[in-house]
């Protein structure tokens, strides 16, 4: 298989993020990444199987909403156009057939022959009506399937956004809680003092 261009993959990831502009999307991505790295490095959040499963699920939902839904929508549209074309062609053929039979019947003088011709025409008309009804049913089924898929895609997008908001809220709450911890504050202060002393030592 042909390897996917990293630039294309990066653009697809950024497009899947919420936001109206490239700057807002990259800002969300950078903020999320920074918060995640800080939480993991400070042991506020431990990466486990549930985290990996959540990331995989979100990626799968993003892939489905970006690839499968547009493909199915285009396929359903093409199928609907094809069926509508068949219906129009069947109607035109039926009209032409009726006109031809009427012309033929008008030239007949034998009552028996005329009756037989009308009977054959009625059978053909019934068959064409049955075919037209079947095609209409197929169009209705295709439209219903597309409507269901569109609803499912919207629902999955809402679920994904809600889960992202919950995850961000949880991480932020843990970070804020840890920042209010006296031991953590002392640890940060000690690290800052140590860094300053190290810089002064280098200057000497």
UniProtKB/Swiss-Prot annotation:
InterPro entries listed in its UniProt record: ATP_synth_Bsub_B/MI25 (IPR008688), ATP_synth_F0_suB (IPR013837)
Chief localisation class: mitochondrion
Keyword Membrane: yes
Disulfide bonds: none
Organism superkingdom: Eukaryota
One Pfam family per UniProt: Mt_ATP-synt_B
Record membrane topology: Multi-pass membrane protein
One GO term describing the cellular component: mitochondrial inner membrane
Keywords: ATP synthesis, CF(0), Hydrogen ion transport, Ion transport, Membrane, Mitochondrion, Mitochondrion inner membrane, Transmembrane, Transmembrane helix, Transport
GO molecular function: proton-transporting ATP synthase activity, rotational mechanism
TM stretches of this protein: 27-47, 52-72
Location within or outside the cell: Mitochondrion inner membrane
Function: Mitochondrial membrane ATP synthase (F(1)F(0) ATP synthase or Complex V) produces ATP from ADP in the presence of a proton gradient across the membrane which is generated by electron transport complexes of the respiratory chain. F-type ATP synthases consist of two structural domains, F(1) - containing the extramembraneous catalytic core, and F(0) - containing the membrane proton channel, linked together by a central stalk and a peripheral stalk.
Family statement drawn from the similarity comment of this UniProt entry: Belongs to the eukaryotic ATPase B chain family.
UniProt subunit comment: F-type ATP synthases have 2 components, the catalytic core F(1) and the membrane-embedded component F(0), linked together by a central stalk and a peripheral stalk. The central stalk, also called rotor shaft, is often seen as part of F(1). The peripheral stalk is seen as part of F(0). F(0) contains the membrane channel next to the rotor. F-type ATP synthases form dimers but each monomer functions independently in ATP generation.
The protein's name: ATP synthase subunit 4, mitochondrial
Native source organism of the sequence: Pichia angusta (Yeast)
Protein's gene: ATP4
